[in-house]
């Protein structure tokens, strides 16, 4: 039997077991640990499913006679390297009815060995060539201020397919807080998001001791609550909100009291009383008890996240934050009290500790804080920049040797499965697994985490790197991220979900509101804790000196070492 050199095989079919792939221009490498596209055991070599002139997927060769009614998939992505929280494997990925049907070997079982029964390519099967590319789940941005609709294409162009947050546009409340309050506002925003190819979960206002006011929002379509200090995050409000959350099953996102007016971090923890809660921007630059809100990442019931402007700590981080904070929280730099408020939130020691806590898996998620001290199009990029900086500073994670699979699995989970689990969306989205919505992002390795080749929303191409539309082929410059047919309002609604509290469906909201986008109830998250966040479960002891702001993690002081240079930056972007 003739053999191919490994390099020749990779050129023809993409990398296979033992091959390593560099992620963009970072120091991070992933290694393929299994090749499902070769069939069970990786032994069915020589007839890999490849599309093109003179290639495999042709009638009575790699294409079988199976009709859609007989189970043929609508789409197969061939030979992609899947990077997910559960591993790094090569596979053909089948999609049917907008959901992932299987990972395995695709083709024609009449002529090929080891074909997965749910990956039989028929005349009705479309093909995307994933060979040599990396496939991830669509990103979940768990901290979105809905300030302007233009955020949606910016997010989609970077692989974000789910938006969790709140707002009504550029109102002062929205510019500061991720809240869509009142049934009328919720219904207007749900209608506004109906034609965009993104999943949406809107958060209602939890800053009240009126349980009736909170239940009213849940029945109107809120998928959870936001507690924000600008509305008054008092211990009484925290307790009342969590009581309603426990009764309804939804998540609560917390932005605590920076000024410590109603209590200190210990008082907030006492009000939480061991109940599950999602702590936004846990480091504190985005808000929260100064200077020690970061200590909440020690607790098993706290689901901690970061927002991306502090990711990772660089020589420019502190300077840009002061101006951002003044605008976002409606402060006046000429008022001494406002300036003191702003400066109390920007601490190099806690930002440096945030880097380490992400690498340990102690801070579990990363979101944007879009246009409110964060950038909606940089969730994915900032995550991998953090991973790169941590590898340079801390070396390989336990279990990693020539490749960084453990670190890659930890970091990809921070913007996919972990936020999905935290908000009760993981039955539908968050990973590349059979049965889930086919929200998928395909990258050339050199552009990983920076510019996707394709973004699939519910199995249909919604966004892509596309050349001049008047050219004779798709590739002539300028190649830009552009909306595709899946971004049109009809397929966008059909391929996306509107997440709501169970109480909304029980109250018949889906029938009353009449959205094109299907409404799906969030799962009960009240018994979920950090232990349920894949690859990000650590609960180290974290202490902050109240005078010097020095942070100690398991007794070891963190020294600030801001990065002066990052990958995935000017090499890819002009501006």
From Swiss-Prot:
Primary subcellular site in the record, as a coarse category: cytoplasm
User: Catalytic activity, per the record?
Assistant: urea + 2 H2O + H(+) = hydrogencarbonate + 2 NH4(+)
The residues listed in the UniProt record as binding Ni(2+) 2, with positions renumbered to this chain, are 226, 255, 281
GO cellular component, alphabetical, reads: cytoplasm
Q: Which residues form the Urease domain?
A: 138-575
Active site, UniProt feature:
329
Name what cofactor the protein needs. Ni cation
Modifications after synthesis and translation: Carboxylation allows a single lysine to coordinate two nickel ions.
Output this protein's name: Urease subunit alpha
Which organism encodes this protein? Answer: Parafrankia sp. (strain EAN1pec)
Q: Which gene encodes it?
A: ureC
